[in-house]
Amino acid sequence: MVDVTDKAVPRMISRTSYQGVGYIHQTWVTPDRLFLLMDDELDEQYYHHNTATRIWDIADLDRPLHIGSHVADTPAIDHNLYVRDGFVYEANYRAGLRILKLDRIAESRLEPAGFFDVYPADDLPEFNGAWSAYPFFPSGVVAVSGIEQGLFVLRPEIP
């Protein structure tokens, strides 16, 4: 954790690790600032497990605590994720856009709510397919970029 209040002088607050680290690529904090979701871009390839989104309790920035992981039903690489209105929008390369509910995050559980597969051939842990997803349009539209597939403009119907 780094305090960047003064951009010219960043200050480390704390540092931690977790079992099975590959390459921490991207994180996002929940709106209440109690939890952090983390994508590790290489763990699926290095350790041969399914897509894992790490969940951290960051209520105490001096002692962030890894409370669990959401493990998906595909081995695709997780790349970029964002949180909006109680959902996680996660670009998982060959598994496409995955939408997860946040309502049980304190129990370290993320529940699948929907998906759109931009690479239907397979879900292998390779670097093609959904690169990112942008869920912040006021209309509810989600833009998903596929590395070779192009741009998908979606309007998810989430129950």
Please give the residue ranges for each predicted region.
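Feature marking well-ordered beta-strand scaffolds used for ligand recognition
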Residues: 1-159
